[in-house]
Amino acid sequence: RWYFYINSAPWLPNRFHGKAVVEGQRKFMGTLWNTYAFFVLYANIDNFDATKYTLNYDQLPVMDKWLLSKLNSMIIEVDDDLDHYKIPEAARALESFVDDMSNWYVRRSRERFWAKGMEQDKINAYMTLYTALVTVAKCAAPMIPFMTEDIYQNLVRSIDKTAPESIHLCDFPVADEKMIDKKLEEDMKEVLDIVVMGRACRNTANIKNRQPIGNMFVKADHSLTDFYVDIIEDELNVKNVTFTDDVRDFTSYTFKPQLKTVGPKYGKQLGGIKEHLSSLDGNAAMDELKAKGALVFDVAGTKVSLSEEDLLIEMSQKEGYVSEADNYMTVVLDTNLTPELI
């Protein structure tokens, strides 16, 4: 059922194959169930009862506020998608939230659940994850009725007999827009993007995460506060993360013509174009491309204008550095291992 929801709109043809079904089950339903099982395991150990506590937003740390912001943004998105019969979009929004909840929030908050006693920080973590699990179950109930019913009966009905008898008798969740903080969501997305690129750099350099790294440099649209930098350093096992406006000391670019598009437009000048592109200062050319949207130059009296679609761009790095980049961010990892790091 989930495979058909998320794969394509109901009125379009759908190719069915077993591997895709298994992958869909693992990616969403398996992740949701594992997160629920994580909560239940530690809630049972601590005899946690959500009816005895309240969720005080003003007392919450940043990670809790981020998850609640994502949760309420997801409610709005899923509700609107279902209103307009956008089934795949609603399913993808649910899947994306569950991925963030499991692979980022729980990952970053596990030690809070392991703490001894029931200090306020631990209560905050329990209440935040409890709220997220119950709410996402209600949002997903029309699509996965049986799993969400199990979650609801165990998390809600077992401690509150006044609650509706079934999740399918509950109202669809309504977003609390006061909990939505788009700046917080954007900053955390940048953290996640940097972490993904940093891991890719480690993989390229064949350096495992347990090996500390001295320095990482990030060129992005805006820098992040120390709170987020500390998360990046911890996730990537890097001693120092530095935001910079220029990574020229570590990287450069090479340009070649995209023959499919450049050939039909400038066939006779193709040789001259290749020669010109090979002679460019890579960083200066990339700056021009981003600023003007094209590289403009003259070849044998013919004006040539090449957009990003007309170019094959490769990023090269200096020895001892590995980099990853997309359209708005570059991450450079210093792979030089000093005796102190080893």
List the model feature ranges, each with a label.
Residues 1-14:
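Alpha-helical recognition segments enriched in aromatics with Gly/Pro capping
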Residues 20-342:
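Feature 926 captures the class I aminoacyl-tRNA synthetase adenylation module centered on the KMSKS loop
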Residues 13-21:
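Short, solvent-exposed helix-loop connector elements
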